[in-house]
């Protein structure tokens, strides 16, 4: 059993070893087919920029058509070799230009030189400090390429780019020749600056940084290029090979042509992680009571080991195709590993591919070190732990069942006495299981020896390259409430985000106070940091909490919830840190961008896998932290390392001597809330924050309910919820009529009030009536109220000026002594509505596209028209493009190339940065629901929906994790249901809905017995099969039965709405 040292998980070694550093595995020397030669003229680079602008601005379902259009035009006008184009669309997958050694800081210095900027000028500082918010400045921040675009545009005299695609590729090749200094880069970038417009340079910078920000990756691009392209890429990771092998769109590969090959890196199979990670559900998903395999999960780097020539040649690469052969040894007697294991294989093993985990072994204490922590350790104590065999003696084994591959691996036919290679070559510890009890027992055994966790695998499945799913599921201790570490810490600083989080705090620095002196005064704070980006917090709440925009309230009653921390964040001076901070001896990158005084801050409770030694002020840090709760009603003095919260170090872990009180989840702040019902309090996933047992000071809100400002109204007797219940009197929100939740409630006639109403009521110690000025939306009942049309000043005079008997001096219906003052506008400091990140990015991209298109010359417009870029009446407006007409049959055919292409576009998501045996799908804080209205019940419907990796909400594919059955007469006949004769209007509505579902990522099922089925669409005018469908689809989980209106409203609102409001009549 593995014994893990308590070190931080570190990325694979990227430092230079003997003058070398890891790069993408080099492309195998290929010979270009004779008829794969471009004979036409390469297009101007601004044509490609035009396509990139469109890809960034378009919705996902339109990207596929755009890609097929550009590929078709290229083949027609240039030739069959699309490699020069595709390498620009996928710069991070280009093996021939693996690294530029150019990051934002170096590019900023280069452009300061190229643009002749004074180093301390505002323009130069904008380039250097591109992440920092610009305040009221219109200049963008957080997107380095866009910041450069604005500075270049203000100074460039180039009106029309002079470079072709071929010329741009040649210049990029020069930048990627090797590690150079600034003086070497400047002449090349200066040549680009003199021949390219600001727009073209923006895209070249994005290519250099290997992130185009177009929300599409290899799956989408290659699926549009050729139907077999992604299958071939999965087993070779080589764009050139894909382009030169599949240059003919009519050519199709045989199955044996997508097998794994020796010395070709491939994209390995990865683990999925269930959202409801109870051991019972994991066991069920993995096939229990059938036998499954449990392997110990290791803290290393996923590695592919290739050997051929009976041990003469060796090749090592990571799961992201980084070549580490130079480190571990290409031939016997070389490297830190090959020299020790060259004789481990049986004599009859000519060639082999093994899948495993690279570890660092300390033979002195006989334990594993966190991989990549020490360069010398990586050189001296490399160990590969093998868990799979995928190729043997010229035969690919990936299509063999896992149980067969495991049997072969451990049969003694592959290795000689493997026990003799302990510390260099070993099998992964594994055990067979049949139920949740077996998983629990093995997990406890692993945890007792400080192991990482488990990976459970089905035994009867083949090896699927570049896939995640429930065939392999990881089980980590911290996913269980009984395991891991929970603690409450004070937020003390943060780092500015970039990209979609520009202008916002994306990472937090947290800490604890040292033990108090005897006289009760406080010592310095000790600080810990969270490298992760607020895991578990919805992004919209991060915006509310820390962004420089927040809710609006009256000038006289500033609230805790409006601009709560806008004035509290202060720039952090690295040379003169705040006196209350005690930071460790770490590099400048570990100092925050901003800090906040403890008395102005707030407390968060985090859960982490463990607490490990680190170089920070407290001497320790958290591993895999995730935010669970946020508290505003706690004092910073409570978070000290004193006798009441004593920490001791033992075996590399911390153990708290006091028990934490478990609190009700603050689920409205978290991504993917789970449904749990409490008859007395309403749906648990919509309850507000859990407050401490503070005394209730008044009862002025005892009959009201609020969804925001919980801490404030709690003191005055109110309850709060995040769900709309039948007995609610109001919903307290920011004045935002565009919020989908708000619009949904407005449609149901619910009063929507502004936060000001709360503050003014508290100031008067009475609940104000619903005045017009405090209502975002007023129901008919509210509009009929006695005081609805009165101003607050009028109401004050009516209600609060009374004689000794308590009677009003001014008649309640009169206005004799009242000045009739009506508000004629919103407060000047009202904020913009916070948009979803993706929607905002697309909107800004469309605006940017319109601006750029308006500056095109006549010649450019003609050339764009020839390349299919000016087919729209309104360029850049994705809503103005006519929808492609196609039959329902064609649109719903999941086997069609277009359907597969659209699916690939939707599946294009960023992989995690961790090159490990695990997959962190579902952990990242970016996976969030825009509005916690409804969704799959994780506990009840965790196995329903399209696929495990689709269980994460995305606003561009809101139905992607769902599967739908449409209750048409035709489908009813197929499924043996009661027949009907619906009207033409009913049929037309259902056809329209099916098209909407597919365009927005949903899957349409024809059978009611489909195991992934989640929803049934039924029209009000043809609902006779409601009871029959309810009964026949009740097992194993009941399905949502909704009308077509639910689909239409979800698409309009760009989020999933509550199904209960759309049941058929």
Curated annotation (Swiss-Prot):
Its main location: nucleus. ATP binds at residues 295, 297-298, 302, 357, 387, 452, 457, 474, 476. Coiled coil: none annotated. It catalyses: ATP + (deoxyribonucleotide)n-3'-hydroxyl + 5'-phospho-(deoxyribonucleotide)m = (deoxyribonucleotide)n+m + AMP + diphosphate. Mg(2+) 2 binds at residue 452. Its EC number is 6.5.1.1. Residues 834-864, 886-900 have a biased composition (Basic and acidic residues). InterPro entries: Adenylation_DNA_ligase_IV (IPR044125), BRCT_dom (IPR001357), BRCT_dom_sf (IPR036420), DNA_ligase_ATP-dep (IPR000977), DNA_ligase_ATP-dep_cent (IPR012310), DNA_ligase_ATP-dep_CS (IPR016059), DNA_ligase_ATP-dep_N (IPR012308), DNA_ligase_N_sf (IPR036599). SMART domains: BRCT (SM00292). SUPFAM superfamilies: BRCT domain, DNA ligase/mRNA capping enzyme, catalytic domain, Nucleic acid-binding proteins. Signal peptide: none annotated. DNA ligase involved in DNA non-homologous end joining (NHEJ); required for double-strand break (DSB) repair. PANTHER family: DNA LIGASE 4. This is DNA ligase 4. The lineage of its organism: Eukaryota, Fungi, Dikarya, Basidiomycota, Agaricomycotina.
């Amino acid at each position: 059993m593995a014994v893990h040292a308590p070190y931080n998980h570190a990325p694979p070694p990227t430092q230079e070893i003997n003058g070398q550093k890891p790069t993408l595995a080099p492309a195998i020397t290929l010979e270009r087919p004779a008829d794969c030669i471009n004979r036409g003229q390469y297009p101007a680079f601004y044509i490609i920029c035009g396509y990139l602008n469109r890809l960034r601005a378009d919705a996902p379902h339109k990207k596929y058509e755009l890609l097929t259009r550009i590929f078709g035009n290229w083949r027609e006008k240039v030739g069959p070799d699309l490699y020069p184009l595709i390498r620009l669309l996928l710069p991070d997958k280009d093996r021939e230009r693996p690294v530029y050694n150019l990051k934002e800081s170096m590019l900023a210095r280069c452009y300061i030189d190229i643009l002749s900027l004074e180093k301390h000028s505002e323009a130069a500082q904008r380039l250097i400090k591109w992440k920092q918010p610009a305040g009221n400045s219109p200049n963008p921040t957080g997107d380095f390429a866009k910041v450069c675009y604005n500075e270049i545009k203000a100074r460039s005299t180039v009106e029309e780019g002079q470079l072709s695609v071929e010329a741009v590729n040649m210049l990029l090749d020069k930048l990627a020749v090797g590690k150079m200094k600034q003086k070497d880069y400047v002449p090349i970038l200066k040549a680009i600056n003199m021949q390219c417009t600001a727009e073209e340079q923006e895209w070249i910078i994005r290519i250099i940084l290997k992130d185009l920000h177009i929300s599409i990756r290899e799956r989408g691009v290659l699926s549009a290029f050729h139907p077999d392209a992604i299958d071939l890429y999965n087993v070779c990771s080589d764009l050139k090979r894909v382009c030169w092998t599949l240059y003919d769109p009519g050519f199709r590969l045989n199955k044996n042509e997508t097998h794994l090959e020796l010395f070709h890196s491939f994209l390995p199979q990865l683990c999925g992680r269930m959202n409801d990670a109870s051991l019972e559900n994991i066991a069920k998903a993995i096939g229990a009571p059938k036998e499954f395999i449990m392997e110990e999960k290791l803290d290393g780097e996923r590695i592919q080991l290739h050997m051929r020539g009976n041990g003469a040649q060796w090749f090592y690469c990571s799961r992201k195709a980084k070549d580490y052969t130079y480190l571990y040894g290409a031939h016997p007697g070389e490297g830190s590993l090959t020299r020790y294991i060259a004789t481990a294989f049986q004599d009859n093993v000519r060639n082999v591919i093994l899948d495993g985990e690279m570890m660092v072994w300390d033979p002195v204490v006989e334990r594993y070190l966190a991989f990549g922590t020490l360069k010398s350790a990586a050189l001296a104590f490399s160990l590969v732990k093998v868990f799979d065999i995928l190729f043997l003696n010229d035969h690919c084994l990936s299509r063999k069942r896992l149980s067969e591959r495991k049997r072969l691996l451990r049969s003694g036919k592959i290795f000689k006495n493997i026990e003799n290679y302990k510390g260099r070559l070993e099998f992964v510890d594994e055990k067979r299981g049949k139920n949740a009890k077996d998983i629990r027992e093995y997990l406890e055994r692993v945890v007792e020896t400080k192991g990482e966790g488990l990976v459970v695998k089905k035994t009867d499945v083949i090896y699927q390259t570049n896939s995640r799913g429930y065939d392999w599921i990881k089980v980590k201790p911290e996913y269980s409430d009984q395991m891991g570490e929970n603690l409450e810490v004070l937020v003390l600083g943060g780092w500015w985000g970039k990209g979609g989080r520009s202008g916002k705090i994306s990472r937090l620095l947290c800490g604890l106070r040292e033990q108090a002196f005897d006289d009760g005064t406080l010592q310095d704070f000790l600080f810990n940091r969270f490298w992760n980006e607020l895991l578990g917090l919805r992004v919209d709440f991060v915006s509310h909490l820390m962004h420089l925009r927040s809710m609006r309230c009256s000038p006289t009653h500033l609230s805790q919830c409006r601009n709560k921390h806008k004035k509290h964040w202060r720039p952090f001076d690295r040379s003169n840190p705040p006196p209350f901070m005690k930071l460790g001896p770490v590099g400048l990158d570990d100092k925050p961008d901003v800090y906040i005084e403890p008395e102005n801050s707030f407390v968060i409770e985090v859960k982490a896998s463990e607490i490990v030694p680190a170089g920070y002020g407290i001497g320790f840090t958290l591993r895999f932290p995730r935010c669970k709760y946020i508290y505003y009603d706690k004092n910073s003095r409570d978070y000290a390392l004193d006798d009441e919260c004593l920490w001791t170090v033992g075996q590399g872990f911390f153990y708290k001597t006091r028990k934490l009180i478990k609190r009700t989840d603050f689920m409205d702040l978290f991504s993917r809330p789970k449904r749990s019902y409490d008859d007395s309090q309403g749906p648990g996933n919509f309850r507000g924050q859990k407050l401490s047992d503070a005394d209730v000071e008044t009862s002025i809100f005892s009959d009201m309910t609020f969804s925001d400002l919980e801490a404030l109204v709690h003191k005055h007797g109110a309850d709060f919820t995040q769900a709309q219940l039948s007995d609610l009197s109001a919903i307290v929100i920011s004045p935002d009529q565009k919020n989908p939740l708000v619009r949904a409630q407005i449609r149901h006639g619910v009063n929507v009030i502004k936060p000001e109403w709360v503050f003014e009521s508290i100031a008067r110690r009475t609940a104000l009536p619903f005045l017009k000025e405090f209502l975002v939306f007023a129901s008919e009942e509210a509009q009929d109220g006695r005081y609805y049309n009165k101003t607050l000043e009028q109401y004050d005079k009516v209600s609060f000026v009374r004689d000794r008997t308590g009677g009003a001096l001014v008649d309640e219906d009169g206005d004799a002594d009242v000045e009739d003052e009506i508000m004629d506008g919103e407060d000047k400091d009202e904020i913009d509505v916070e948009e979803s990140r993706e929607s905002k990015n697309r909107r800004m991209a469309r605006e940017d596209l319109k601006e750029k298109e308006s500056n095109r010359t006549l010649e450019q417009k003609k050339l764009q028209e020839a390349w299919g870029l000016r087919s729209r009446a309104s360029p850049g407006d994705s809503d103005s493009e006519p929808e492609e007409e196609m039959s329902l049959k064609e649109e719903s055919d999941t086997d069609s190339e277009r359907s597969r292409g659209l699916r690939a576009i939707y599946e294009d998501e960023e992989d995690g940065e961790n090159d490990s045996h695990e997959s962190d799908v579902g952990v990242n804080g970016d996976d969030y629901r825009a509005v916690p209205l409804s969704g799959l019940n994780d506990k009840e419907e965790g196995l329903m929906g399209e696929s495990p990796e689709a269980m994460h909400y995305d606003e561009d594919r809101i139905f992607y994790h769902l599967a739908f059955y449409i209750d048409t007469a035709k489908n009813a006949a197929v499924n043996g249901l009661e027949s009907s004769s619906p009207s033409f209007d009913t049929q037309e509505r259902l056809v329209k809905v099916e098209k909407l579902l597919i365009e927005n990522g949903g899957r349409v099922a024809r059978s009611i017995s489909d195991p992934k089925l989640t929803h049934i669409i039924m029209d009000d005018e043809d609902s006779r099969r409601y009871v029959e469908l309810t009964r026949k689809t009740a097992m194993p989980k009941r399905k949502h039965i909704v009308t077509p209106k639910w689909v239409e409203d979800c698409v309009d609102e760009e989020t999933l709405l509550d199904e209960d409001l759309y049941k058929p009549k």
